């Protein structure tokens, strides 16, 4: 909204210096600062409110260190969503389809997560929202994003095709399969971030690193000169995603102020599902979905550990009559907790791994 207001003021009065409003880098920085200020100013008030209403229940099977985390409020994802949405609406071109698709994804899955958290911590319903209803919400969002982009002729030509990472000469045309692909990616990534949200700061920090790389990809994809030089698909409007991405990064960093160990608040499913859907939708819109195993590497590894654990347990139970486990506990971060690693050490090492994976994904820009 501020973009349109300041553009109008510039058109009428032409004050010096206001031309910076046309620069994506300026608005991305402004969006980041705005999101961070919102978190730091309103965060304590939101935490005080949540502390009286919604205390996170601790699972009996959780590691010993985790069971000490009592009387800590959840639903902190509300402050993340507030910061991103307000900042995005202020600084991005809200008329761009990419902008409202990302903002919609965050609100949509944030609402699904909110219902789940509310049922668990307020209504005391064990398990919260049924898994099938979460899947319905994820599939519906994927269908909206995939369907809109596929049937919009101006977007379909660009988004239904992609290049293979490390081999840019090979182009894949998804065709109608772009819609089920969008559904799968939205569902998989939002669940992956949800699984990763088990240690103080792990999901927020990993998301900040992941989305920061997506911000870079979005900026390059939306700039015709850079896209041509790097031999990547130029997508008009993708640059606006940079602004939202930086708002997400700043919101996650601001949330770490309160969520770093020892945490004062948890993001809950409200935050993890919202952030996961944002990562998925941004990757889809800027054609980096095939790079997600690197860009969202920690989330991918955490999910893989759960799949391997459950699959091996079922296989050995069927084969031997007794289920066996590969990891001491899944997701993987709990395995290291069981081994006696300090929570801060696990989180920081996972962040380092995520940085290395993101840097690897950035190498694809120069590979022909």
From Swiss-Prot:
This is Phospho-N-acetylmuramoyl-pentapeptide-transferase. It comes from Chloroherpeton thalassium (strain ATCC 35110 / GB-78). GO terms for molecular function: metal ion binding; phospho-N-acetylmuramoyl-pentapeptide-transferase activity; UDP-N-acetylmuramoyl-L-alanyl-D-glutamyl-meso-2,6-diaminopimelyl-D-alanyl-D-alanine:undecaprenyl-phosphate transferase activity. NCBIfam families: mraY. One of its GO terms (biological process) is peptidoglycan biosynthetic process. One of its GO terms (cellular component) is plasma membrane. Pfam families: Glycos_transf_4. Its EC number is 2.7.8.13. The chain crosses the membrane at residues 23-43, 72-92, 94-114, 139-159, 170-190, 201-221, 238-258, 265-286, 345-365. It is a multi-pass membrane protein. It is an enzyme of class 2 (transferase).
């Amino acid at each position: 909204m501020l973009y349109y207001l300041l553009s109008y003021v510039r058109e009428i009065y032409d004050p010096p210096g206001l031309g910076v409003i046309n620069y994506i880098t300026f608005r991305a920085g402004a969006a980041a600062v705005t999101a961070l200020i919102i978190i730091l100013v309103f965060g304590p008030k939101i935490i005080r409110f949540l502390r009286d209403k919604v205390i996170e229940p601790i699972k009996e099977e959780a590691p010993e260190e985790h069971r000490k985390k009592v009387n800590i409020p959840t639903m902190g994802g509300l402050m993340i969503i507030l910061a991103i949405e307000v900042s995005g609406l202020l600084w991005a071109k809200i008329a761009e389809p990419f902008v409202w698709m990302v903002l919609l994804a965050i609100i949509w899955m944030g609402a699904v997560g909110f219902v789940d958290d509310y049922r668990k911590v307020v209504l005391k319903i064990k398990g919260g929202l049924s898994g099938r209803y979460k899947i319905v919400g994820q599939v519906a969002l994927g269908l909206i994003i995939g369907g809109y982009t596929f049937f919009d002729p101006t977007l379909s030509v660009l988004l239904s095709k992609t290049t293979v990472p490390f081999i840019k000469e090979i182009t894949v045309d998804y065709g109608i399969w772009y819609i089920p692909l969008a559904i799968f990616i939205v569902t998989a990534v939002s669940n992956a971030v949800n699984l990763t949200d088990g240690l103080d700061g792990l999901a927020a920090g990993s998301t900040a690193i992941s989305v920061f790389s997506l911000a870079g990809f979005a900026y390059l994809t939306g700039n015709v000169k850079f896209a041509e030089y790097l031999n990547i698909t130029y997508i008009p409007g993708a640059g606006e995603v940079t602004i939202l991405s930086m708002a997400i990064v700043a919101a996650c960093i601001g949330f770490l102020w309160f969520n770093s160990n020892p945490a004062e608040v948890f993001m809950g499913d409200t935050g993890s599902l919202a952030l996961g859907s944002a990562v998925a939708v941004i990757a889809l819109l800027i054609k980096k979905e095939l790079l997600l195993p690197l860009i969202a590497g920690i989330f991918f590894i955490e999910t893989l550990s759960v799949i391997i654990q459950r699959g091996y347990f079922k296989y050995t139970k069927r084969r031997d009559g007794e289920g066996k486990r590969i990891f001491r506990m899944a997701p993987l971060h709990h395995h290291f907790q069981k081994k006696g690693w300090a929570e801060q050490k696990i989180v920081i090492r996972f962040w380092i791994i995520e940085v290395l994976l993101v840097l690897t994904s950035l190498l694809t820009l120069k590979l022909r």
